[in-house]
């Protein structure tokens, strides 16, 4: 009885091990060997050249996304002290108003009240500026993640194009590969990229709304100071460089 149970367990463990090896094999990256590809003429590599160009474009987009993230982080560091400066302006304006009230001059009081209003509005502007830059960092980070998924997709498409080139050239080496495995890799990477791009689009929308709020408060302060409003206004946020697009 014990030997029967032991034999059953041993057989089950072997089956599990074999199955695991099969799963690992299916989940591994599907690639076409350079040796097989090297048997083709350059004129037979059209699909490969196009896929390689798409991969290069995806890598360039990632570099741009990294640069945008760094710029947003640097801008936030510069902007953060502005909130302290705004509070200092409020404190100064409040002191002037108190002094004006003691003097009893209506004109001086009105002027001090206006200065206090401008100082408070300036604080709102600085708050909105920091909030926008924080959203900009989130958007840049999401964009960077999307470009990484785009690179993964481009790599899968590159391998798929290599197999396609072998098949079009009627190379016997093409029979060594299972086309469905390459198709599955492209489909899986495509879903990952689509999900990441959706998150990046949502982050971009949030950054745009924060930018619009900042522009409104900025224009409010400019109007009170008799200055020209910010060019463009709400909705004029420049589109970031290197936005993830379908390769």
Predicted features by range, described:
Residues 33, 37-242, 247:
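Extended amphipathic alpha-helical heptad-repeat regions
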Residues 17, 21-25:
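Hydrophobic core
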Residues 27-32:
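Bacterial signal peptide processing site
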């Amino acid at each position: 009885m014990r030997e029967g149970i032991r034999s059953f367990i041993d057989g089950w463990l072997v089956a599990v091990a074999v199955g695991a090896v099969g799963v690992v094999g299916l989940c591994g990256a599907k690639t076409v060997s350079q040796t097989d590809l090297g048997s083709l003429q350059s004129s037979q590599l059209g699909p490969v050249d196009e896929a390689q160009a798409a991969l290069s474009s995806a890598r360039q987009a990632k570099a741009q996304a990294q640069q945008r993230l760094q710029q947003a982080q640097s801008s936030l560091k510069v902007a953060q002290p502005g909130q302290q400066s705004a509070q200092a302006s409020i404190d100064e304006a409040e002191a002037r108003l108190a002094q004006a009230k003691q003097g009893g001059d209506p004109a001086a009081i009105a002027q001090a009240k206006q200065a206090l209003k401008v100082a408070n509005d300036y604080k709102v502007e600085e708050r909105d500026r920091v909030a926008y830059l924080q959203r900009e960092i989130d958007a840049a980070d999401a964009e960077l993640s999307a470009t990484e998924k785009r690179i993964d997709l481009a790599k899968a498409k590159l391998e798929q194009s290599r197999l396609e080139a072998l098949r079009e050239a009627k190379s016997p080496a093409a029979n060594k590969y299972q086309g469905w495995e390459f198709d599955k890799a492209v489909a899986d990477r495509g879903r990952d990229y689509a999900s990441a791009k959706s998150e990046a689009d949502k982050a971009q929308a949030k950054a745009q709304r924060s930018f619009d709020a900042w522009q409104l408060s900025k224009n409010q302060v400019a109007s009170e100071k008799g200055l020209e409003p910010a060019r463009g206004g709400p909705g004029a946020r420049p589109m970031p460089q290197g936005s993830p697009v379908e390769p």
